[in-house]
Amino acid sequence: MKKTAVIVFSGGQDSTTCLIHALPLYDEVHCITFDYGQRHHAEIETAQRLSKQLGATVHKVLDASLLNELAISSLTRDNIPVPTVNSSGESLPSTFVPGRNILFLTLASIYAYQVKAETVITGVCETDFSGYPDCRDEFVKALNKALELGMEYKLRLETPLMWLNKAETWALADYHNQLELVREQTLTCYNGIMGSGCANCDACNLRAKGLNAYLENKTQVMDSLKSKMGLK
């Protein structure tokens, strides 16, 4: 029986690592990128390029522009500054887009239903993240149950990075011999700068700290990754 997965794909470090990891595990991997009026259109262009370069079966860009009207965030509004690493903390940073993962995972699951995919993959992570509530394991499990009930369809929301720290996420890219591609060709920066980014926003800070931690202790981090994910 053909195994098919759908990936919520932004062209950033996490979703690209998920794509790299999924490709040898599934017969078909479909990438879904959402155009929600995000601050930097380069995100969509990067996702299109990487999905083709890495060999995804299908890549679709879906219009989710309604989210831009409803969700006010520094990632959807040019007049709201992206916070720096040293910004004093609110309970949620201004980069949080309320409802984004709810909407994206729901739409990806509807697409999965149509193509008879059994898995929807997302790169959310509870270990190293910016405090977003929709990156938590309990949220994903609750939404998974709701989607199965609402569509009467057996579906798994898979989160391969959920319990990895950023160093281990870098190790996973290296495990698949794609460390340099992820390092140089993905777009994680909230200010829209490719690769290492601006070095000033929270996304770049997490990414750089994780990479440094991995490069300083590759063997130990790789062993930890293999233990967590059951890799050989």
Curated annotation (Swiss-Prot):
GO molecular function: ATP binding; ligase activity, forming carbon-nitrogen bonds; zinc ion binding
Cofactor binding summary note: Binds 1 zinc ion per subunit.
EC number(s) stated in the UniProt entry for this protein: 6.3.4.20
Signal peptide: none
Binding site for Zn(2+): 189, 198, 201, 204
UniProt pathway: Purine metabolism; 7-cyano-7-deazaguanine biosynthesis
Cofactor(s) required for function per UniProt: Zn(2+)
Disulfide bond sites: none
Annotated residues for binding of ATP: 9-19
Keywords: ATP-binding, Ligase, Metal-binding, Nucleotide-binding, Queuosine biosynthesis, Zinc
Catalytic activity: 7-carboxy-7-deazaguanine + NH4(+) + ATP = 7-cyano-7-deazaguanine + ADP + phosphate + H2O + H(+)
InterPro entries for this protein: QueC, Rossmann-like_a/b/a_fold
One annotated GO biological process: queuosine biosynthetic process
Pfam families: QueC (PF06508)
Superkingdom in the source lineage: Bacteria
Enzymatic class: ligase
Function, in words: Catalyzes the ATP-dependent conversion of 7-carboxy-7-deazaguanine (CDG) to 7-cyano-7-deazaguanine (preQ(0)).
PANTHER family, alphabetized: 7-CYANO-7-DEAZAGUANINE SYNTHASE
HAMAP family for the chain: QueC
Family: Belongs to the QueC family.
Name of the protein this chain belongs to: 7-cyano-7-deazaguanine synthase 2
Species of the source: Pseudomonas fluorescens (strain ATCC BAA-477 / NRRL B-23932 / Pf-5)
